UniProtKB/Swiss-Prot annotation:
Superkingdom in the source lineage: Eukaryota
Organism this protein belongs to: Gracilaria tenuistipitata var. liui (Red alga)
Protein name: Protein translocase subunit SecA
Location(s) in or outside the cell: Plastid, Chloroplast stroma; Plastid, Chloroplast thylakoid membrane
Lineage of the species this protein comes from: Eukaryota, Rhodophyta, Florideophyceae, Rhodymeniophycidae, Gracilariales
Annotated keywords: ATP-binding, Chloroplast, Membrane, Nucleotide-binding, Plastid, Protein transport, Thylakoid, Translocase, Translocation, Transport
Length: 882
C-alpha cells in the first residue's frame, strides 16, 4: 500500500518530465549565444506575471542543455524529479552518487530567475568551493552569476557574492553573517539581502544533528583562572558514585551530600552555592571535563589549544568553543593556557535561522527516519527519489560479541581476510580514539591501511585517502568524516589519482618534504613521469612566495583548467597530466572489474550510532550508482548505545548468555533490543530538540522585533523622529506612574524625574498641574520635549554640522546592543531555572513565556529611557578642530 502511494506521488511528475524533454529537442539546436539569451527571456516572463511553476519545464530544459554542453553529463529523469521536489519546497532523499550537486543547480537556476537570490548551503568549505566551481562552469552558458562565501572574505567581497543569482555558503558562515549583519554599526556593513530560497545539502545533518547547537557570537569576559585550576585539582580527588553521580543519558553531574561536604572542607568555605562567591559551576564543569568530555573523542589538543570534534561528522570545529566555562575547565584539565570566558553578544539556532526563508528545501541520502520531525518543525515533506540504477548493496546481519575486546579482534580478523583477497574495505569508527585503537591492531597484524580522522596530519590526506578507498587491497579506517559529501569510486578516481601523482612529482622536483605518498605509484605511471624532463625554472610556480603543498595543488588545478598556458614548460606539464590521466583511466577500469568480482566495497561499522541515519550514511558508501557492495556492523554488549539506552533486557541477556566469547551472538531478542535502543535514543533527542524549539521560539520572536528595530535605525538618515518617539513613550510611562501614585512627595519626585530627563531648567511644582487632565499634561510635556531637543540640536549643529545625527544613531545602536546582550544573559538564567516550576504544579513553558515577556518589556523600557537620557543629558567634550 505504501509503495503504491509513493509510486503515485512520483508518477505525477511524469507529464512535466515529458514536457522538459519535448522543449529540450528545440533547445539543443540553439547556438551558445541563443542559449545565453534564454535567461533574459524567462526573467521577462516572470515580470509579466508568469509564476515559476509555469516556466519550470522550459527553464529545466535550458539548464539540462547547459549541463550537457559544459560538462558532457546528461541529466537522468530521476534527477529532474529531484529538482522538481526541491522547487516545491520539499526534501529530496537521494542516495550517494545520484548527482545531488547537479539537481541543486537545476532548481537554483529556476528560482534565481526572480532576481531575489538563491542560497545553496553545504556542510563544509570544501564542498561549497567544489560545487560552486561546477555551478560557475554551467551558469556561464546561461548568463547567471554564481558566488561563493568564505570566512576570510571582506565585507565588500561577501556583499558581491550574496548579490549573485546563486550563492554557495556553509551553514555556519550563513548564520554568523546574519548575526554580524544585526550587529553592524553602518548600513553599508550589511552583506546579506533577503532570505528568499535555500537549498540545504545534507539537510538532515544541519536541521537535525546541529539543531541543538546554537550559533553564538561572543566577546571577552574576565575570568578567575585560579578557580578553574583549584576546581580541576579537587575534581581529580573526588570519587564517582561516592562524591558525585553521572547521568550519561543527559550528560549531567550531581554532587552528593558527601561530595558537597568534601569540597567545602577542601576550599575552606561554608557554602559552595554562595551567590557572592559561587564555586559550584566551576566544580561541575571540572567533573564534566574529567568524566564526560574525553581527549581524542570529544576534542583534540593542537598547538596548546582545545579543538572540538563534531560528534556527527568527525571533523574538527576550528574556532568553536564550549560555553558557560566548560571550555576553560577542559583547558585546565589538559594543563594548557586558560583563555578568557566569553559573554554572548548575539545568538541564533539553526532551527530559527532557516525558518527565516520564504521557501526552504533540502537534499540528503538519509532523511526518511526523521521525516516526522522535519515535517512538524520545518514543514518539510520528505520524498524518496528512486535511484537511476537499482541498489545492489547487501546489508548483512549484525554480529554481536559479548565483550568489546572480542569485537575488535573479530574486526581485525575480517580486515586481515579482506586485505589478503584484495577487497577494498572501509571501517567506520565513532571517534578518533577508536580509529587509532584499530590502527594499532592492524599495525601488529602488518596490514597496510589508511587512517582518516580529525587529527590534522590525517585531515591533510583526506583527498588522497578517499581517492584510493575503492582500490584493490585498500583498507581505510575512518571516523564519520567519510560519511558526507564524498564518493568512493571502485578501482579509484583517475582524475584525483593523476593530480596526486603530479603533485608528488612537483614536490620532489622542488626539493620539498613529501608529507604523504600514494600507496604505490604504478610502474607505468613512474615511467611516464620519468620520460618528461621539465625545466623547473621556467614554471610560473616560482612566482609564489613560500611554496607549499596547498600552493602546488592550486597551481596544478590552474594548469589543468587553463587551455592556453603561458609557457612551453606549463604546456608540457599539462600534457604530462593528460598522459598520466589516460593511463590511470585504464588502470582504474581494470581494477574496478577485479573489485566487482570480489563483491565491491565492503563497509564495516564498529558501533551503532545514536541515530539510524548515521548508520545508513556509512552503509551508503557502498553500492554507489548500481555497483555491488556489502555492509556489516560488528557490535558488543559493552557498546555505549546498548549500555546506556539498552535497558534491563540487555543486562539480563548478558548474565544469561553462557556461550563462548569468540562466538558472535545472533538473537531475535537482541536485534529487537538493538532497534528499540536506537529508537529510544532518537525519540529522546527529538524530544530535546522539540523542547528547545518551543523555548527558542519565545526568544526568536523577541530577536525579530529587536533586529527589525535596529534595521529601521540603520536605514534611517533622520533618526531625530526615533529619539522623539522613544522620549514620548518614556514620558507616557512616567505619567502613568504619576497618576497611579497617591503620595504627594512621590508625585513631586516623579515630576522632577521628568524635568531631569527632558533637561528642563525651570522648577515646576506639581500643584500647578492639578487643573490639567492627563492629555493636557502629556501635550505640555511633549511640547517641552521638542523645545528642549531643538535647542540641543541647534547647539550641536553649531559645534559640528551633522554631529547630532551621528550621536543619535550611536546612542540608539549602542543601547539596543547592550540591552539585548544583558537580556540574553537573563534569558539564559531564566531557561536554566524555569524547570523547577513544575514542582509547583506549573507548566514551565507557560511560565517561561510569561516571565520572558516581562523581561522583554523591561528591556524595551530601559532602551527608551537610557537613549532619551543620554541624548538629552550627556555632556560632550568636543575638539572642534578635529
Amino acid at each position: 500500500m505504501f509503495n503504491f502511494f509513493k509510486k503515485n506521488k512520483l508518477n505525477k511528475f511524469q507529464n512535466t518530465i515529458n514536457e522538459i524533454h519535448q522543449i529540450g529537442n528545440t533547445v539543443k539546436n540553439y547556438s551558445d549565444a541563443e542559449l545565453k539569451k534564454q535567461t533574459h527571456k524567462l526573467k521577462k516572463k516572470i515580470i509579466q506575471n508568469s509564476n515559476l511553476t509555469e516556466i519550470l519545464p522550459e527553464s529545466f530544459a535550458i539548464v539540462k542543455e547547459a549541463i550537457k554542453r559544459s560538462t558532457g553529463m546528461i541529466l537522468f529523469d530521476v534527477q529532474l524529479v529531484g529538482s522538481i521536489v526541491l522547487h516545491q519546497g520539499q526534501i529530496a532523499e537521494m542516495k550517494t552518487g545520484e548527482g545531488k550537486t547537479i539537481v541543486a543547480i537545476t532548481t537554483g537556476y529556476l528560482n534565481a530567475l526572480t532576481s531575489k537570490g538563491v542560497h545553496i548551503i553545504t556542510v563544509n568549505d570544501y564542498l561549497a568551493k567544489r560545487d560552486s566551481e561546477l555551478a560557475q562552469k554551467i551558469c556561464s552558458y546561461i548568463d547567471l552569476k554564481v558566488g561563493l562565501i568564505t570566512q576570510s572574505m571582506t565585507y565588500e567581497e561577501k556583499k558581491r557574492a550574496y548579490d549573485c543569482d546563486i550563492t554557495y555558503i556553509t551553514n555556519s558562515e550563513l548564520g554568523f553573517d546574519y548575526l554580524r549583519d544585526n550587529m553592524a554599526i553602518e548600513f553599508n556593513q550589511i552583506v546579506q539581502r533577503g532570505f528568499n530560497f535555500a537549498i540545504i545539502d545534507e539537510v538532515d545533518s544541519i536541521l537535525i544533528d546541529e539543531a541543538r547547537t546554537p550559533l553564538i557570537i561572543s566577546g571577552p569576559f574576565e575570568i578567575e583562572i585560579n578557580k578553574y585550576k583549584k576546581s580541576t585539582s579537587i575534581a581529580n580527588t573526588l570519587q564517582k558514585d561516592l562524591d558525585y553521580e553521572i547521568d550519561e543519558k543527559t550528560k549531567n553531574i550531581t554532587l552528593t551530600e558527601k561530595g558537597i561536604s568534601r569540597c567545602e572542607n577542601m576550599l575552606n568555605i561554608d557554602n559552595l552555592y554562595d551567590i557572592h562567591d559561587s564555586w559550584i559551576q566551576y566544580l561541575l564543569n571540572s567533573l564534566k571535563a574529567k568524566d564526560l568530555f574525553l581527549k581524542n573523542q570529544h576534542y583534540i589538543v593542537k598547538n596548546n589549544e582545545i579543538i572540538i570534534v563534531d560528534e556527527f561528522t568527525g571533523r574538527v570545529m576550528q574556532g568553536r568553543r564550549w560555553s558557560d566555562g566548560l571550555h576553560q575547565a577542559i583547558e585546565s584539565k589538559e594543563n594548557i593556557p586558560i583563555q578568557q570566558e566569553n559573554k554572548t553578544l548575539a545568538s541564533i539556532t539553526y532551527q530559527n535561522l532557516f525558518l527565516l526563508y520564504e521557501k526552504l528545501s533540502g537534499m540528503t541520502g538519509t532523511a526518511k527516519t526523521e521525516e516526522t520531525e522535519l515535517d512538524k518543525i520545518y514543514n518539510l515533506e520528505v520524498l524518496e527519489i528512486p535511484t537511476n540504477k537499482i541498489c545492489k548493496r547487501q546489508d548483512l546481519p549484525d554480529l554481536v560479541y559479548k565483550t568489546e575486546y572480542k569485537k575488535w579482534q573479530a574486526i581485525a580478523d575480517e580486515c586481515f581476510d579482506m586485505y589478503h583477497i584484495g577487497r577494498p574495505t572501509l571501517i567506520g569508527t565513532t571517534n578518533v580514539e577508536k580509529s587509532e585503537l584499530l590502527a594499532k591492531i592492524l599495525m601488529e597484524l602488518q596490514i597496510p591501511f589508511n587512517l582518516l580522522n580529525a587529527k590534522p596530519e590525517n585531515v591533510s590526506r583526506e583527498a588522497e585517502i578517499i581517492t584510493q578507498a575503492g582500490r584493490k587491497n585498500t583498507i581505510t579506517i575512518s571516523t564519520n568524516m567519510a560519511g558526507r559529501g564524498t564518493d568512493i569510486i571502485l578501482g579509484g578516481n583517475p582524475e584525483a589519482l593523476s593530480k596526486l601523482a603530479l603533485t608528488y612529482y612537483l614536490q620532489n622536483k622542488l626539493g620539498l618534504k613529501v608529507n604523504y605518498l600514494l600507496n604505490n605509484i604504478e610502474t607505468q605511471i613512474t615511467t611516464i613521469i620519468n620520460n618528461y624532463v621539465l625545466d623547473m625554472q621556467e614554471l610560473d610556480i616560482y612566482k609564489y612566495k613560500n611554496i607549499d603543498l596547498k600552493k602546488i595543488q592550486y597551481y596544478i588545478e590552474k594548469i589543468i583548467k587553463n587551455e592556453h598556458t603561458k609557457y612551453s614548460e606549463e604546456e608540457k606539464l599539462q600534457k604530462l597530466y593528460l598522459k598520466i590521466l589516460s593511463e590511470y583511466k585504464n588502470i582504474c577500469y581494470q581494477e574496478k572489474q577485479e573489485v566487482l568480482k570480489l563483491g565491491g566495497l565492503y563497509v564495516i561499522g564498529t558501533e551503532r550510532h545514536e541515530s539510524r541515519r548515521i548508520d545508513n550514511q556509512l552503509r551508503g558508501r557502498a553500492g554507489r550508482q548500481g555497483d555491488i557492495g556489502a555492509s556489516r556492523f560488528f557490535l558488543s554488549l559493552e557498546d555505549n548505545l546498548l549500555r546506556i539506552f539498552g535497558g534491563d533486557k540487555i543486562s539480563q541477556l548478558m548474565d544469561n548468555l553462557n556461550i563462548d566469547e569468540h562466538t558472535p551472538i545472533e538473537s531475535i531478542i537482541l536485534s529487537k533490543s538493538l532497534d528499540s535502543a536506537q529508537k529510544k535514543v532518537e525519540s529522546y533527542f527529538y524530544d530535546i530538540r522539540k523542547q528547545l524549539f518551543e523555548y527558542d521560539e519565545v526568544i526568536n520572536n523577541q530577536r525579530q522585533a529587536i533586529y527589525a528595530e535596529r534595521k529601521r535605525i540603520l536605514q534611517s538618515s533622520f533618526t531625530r523622529d526615533c529619539i522623539i518617539e522613544y522620549a514620548e513613550s518614556t514620558i507616557d510611562e512616567i505619567l502613568t506612574a504619576f497618576y497611579r501614585e497617591d503620595n504627594i512627595n512621590n508625585k513631586n519626585h516623579i515630576i522632577k524625574k521628568i524635568y531631569q530627563l527632558l533637561n528642563l531648567t525651570e522648577n515646576f511644582h506639581f500643584n500647578t498641574l492639578y487643573d490639567m487632565n492627563y492629555k493636557q499634561i502629556q501635550e505640555f510635556l511633549y511640547e517641552q520635549l521638542r523645545i528642549s531637543y531643538d535647542l540641543r540640536e541647534s547647539y550641536l549643529e553649531q559645534l559640528r554640522p551633522g554631529l547630532i545625527r551621528k550621536l543619535e544613531k550611536y546612542y540608539l545602536l549602542q543601547q539596543i546592543d547592550k540591552a539585548w546582550q544583558d537580556h540574553l544573559d537573563k534569558m539564559a538564567l531564566l531557561r536554566e531555572s524555569i524547570g523547577w516550576r513544575s514542582y509547583g504544579q506549573q507548566d514551565p513553558l507557560v511560565e517561561y513565556k510569561n516571565e520572558a515577556f516581562s523581561l522583554f518589556i523591561n528591556m524595551v523600557r530601559y532602551i527608551r529611557q537610557t537613549v532619551t537620557y543620554l541624548t538629552m543629558r550627556s555632556r560632550l567634550i568636543i575638539n572642534v578642530n578635529n
